[in-house]
């Protein structure tokens, strides 16, 4: 399938990240047939509160799997894990910090309860949707570089953990606390950054412009 996408000269390819675009371009795809339309979140669907119910807690939201590395961080106090469980890692689903899998509507209402979100995955296709959901809900983020492709990492509520610090639990915990302390004071600014950059309110316009620009 990938080979067909690269060699295709008839159909347009919509890339959900600039990472995808650069990969296709590098492998020889016709750049005239590549369009970038990033993934995003409908911010109006996400409940937002300026004062979170759990300001001293971090949410780790995502399928429990090796790539997302939740098993490394289960001993950090102040982190709660949500996502579909798979028995592919040593993650212990019987621990109190694992809240199971949320229904979509519940997620829309309760992401905003937390002080911040973390995602230290070892590979992502651009910035994951869950990070954009966190931002429009007012949460700061602590991420790996692989989950930060579309983020402004100079912002005080965006913390990137270097690869060589992934297994330094004390360091990760320190950065989570630092990020939470900053993020709970900037909830409105964080949400506005999420809306300005990752809301479908903006991205639909990009999609329409891409469609109208097709030759």
Feature-to-residue mapping (PLM):
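Conserved donor-binding/catalytic core segment of Leloir-type glycosyltransferases
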Residues: 50-68, 74-80
